[in-house]
Amino acid sequence: MISDELRAANSAGAIATGLLALKIPVPLTTVQWADRHYYLPKESSYTPGRWETLPFQVAIMNSMGNDRIRTVNLIKSARVGYTKMLLGVEAYFIEHKSRNSLLFQPTDSAAEDFMKSHVEPTIRDVPVLLDLAPWFGRKHRDNTLTLKRFSSGVGFWCLGGAAAKNYREKSVDVVCYDELSSFEPDVEKEGSPTLLEIGRAHV
């Protein structure tokens, strides 16, 4: 027979599990989230370890993660940490805001390389992302070179921007471009990369 104490403990556990669905995280800005949770992997960083937002990066990252700002265009020099900022913002959207997002690289091969050398090590080294990736390190339909589908249901795509088909049939809230100046100005005669994704947030 089940004792009253065990029955009470089981009930309390079931109630606690059920209430998790109602838990709302304390809202954080992009920079607050990144300084608390984001880590740079050794494979693709000059200074691996815990991320610390530099003063000039604060406004950029907070603009990228702000729901009231629909488009962010950044003209930059080399070596300002843009790719790492972009990854931090993507991680923020995935874990903190539960947003489906799509990151474009200039070509399909560049997108696959980016997924392998930047995204996968970032998932591994950011504990709150790894918690959402039970498939990490093994073959799984939610773990491909074009899509990472997290246990929260959030999807992250990384695709090449040279093929018009990559702009279709993706239900995402956020679209980011890395190295936009390297994209074809007219994607297979269907329009510019940013016009093909019009109506969504752009970074």
Annotated model-derived regions:
Residues 1-200:
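Phosphate/NTP-binding elements of NTP-utilizing enzymes
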